[in-house]
Design a protein with these regions (language model features):
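Class I (Rossmann-like) S-adenosyl-L-methionine-dependent methyltransferase catalytic domain
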Residues: 2-44, 54-101, 125, 142-219
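A short glycine-rich, Lys/Arg-flanked "PGG" loop and its adjoining helix->strand segment in the class I
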Residues: 127-139
Length: 219
């Protein structure tokens, strides 16, 4: 059974509702910017930003000519993304939804982005979300995303609620976080061809993340 994301969505709602909470989440990640030429070279037209937050990546992709759908569980994040898109004259398809049941047809997208999203849950949750992502991608489409390695400084902190899955109660990490080694990640991406797999630091010391680029394999 999938772990509920209620606590995570509540936390993001509170964060996205304030100027201070949004401040670090307004600019697209450098890796996403860097992938744009490859998307253009492949003729990508349709994109899904899965867990779009306040819309930083969805807006970037749309402003560079892609037809973008974006989902998030946070109403506050979607509200800010919608208002920003209107202010910039950018067209975005925005829906309140989660990665557990994507509201799109099979083979809808040339590109799916999932930045700091799918690891909120257990190993089984991540596997089900990747199956949903695979379903809505066209054969040969690109996936870009992040996950958490066991090298991350927060691995093992808090309550263990499933293998390699932890919750730190009373903190911003008060919802499940799943961590994995390279072998587990490769197994999770069995339906994809991994094109790039690196570990990179994010904002804080020890905040290692997997950075993934993969191509959807055909049936």
């Amino acid at each position: 059974m999938a772990m509920p994301l209620t606590t995570a969505i509540d936390a993001w709602d509170k964060r996205w509702a304030t100027v201070e909470g949004r401040a670090d989440w307004l600019d697209p990640a450098p890796d996403v910017i860097a992938l744009l030429p490859e998307l253009k070279a492949r003729g990508a037209r349709t994109a899904l930003d899965l867990g779009c937050g306040v819309g930083r990546h969805a807006l970037f992709l749309a402003e560079h000519g892609l037809i973008v759908e974006a989902i998030d569980g946070s109403a506050a994040g979607l509200k800010f993304a919608r208002e920003t898109a209107q202010a910039r004259g950018v067209s975005l398809g925005l829906q309140q939804a989660t990665a557990d049941a994507l509201p799109f047809d099979e083979g809808s997208f040339d590109f799916v982005l999932s930045w700091n999203v799918i690891h909120h849950g257990s190993l089984g949750d991540v596997g089900r979300r990747l199956a949903e992502i695979w379903r809505v991608m066209k054969p040969g489409a690109l996936y870009q995303g992040t996950m958490l390695p066991t090298r991350n400084i927060n691995y093992g902190r808090g309550r263990t609620i499933a293998p390699d899955t932890f919750v730190v109660d009373g903190s911003e990490r008060g919802h499940p976080h799943f961590y994995c080694d390279a072998a587990t990640l490769v197994a999770l991406f069995a339906g994809f061809e991994l094109l790039s797999l690196t570990q990179q630091l994010h904002r804080k010391p020890g905040s290692w993340h997997w950075h993934i680029i993969a191509e959807r394999r055909p049936l």
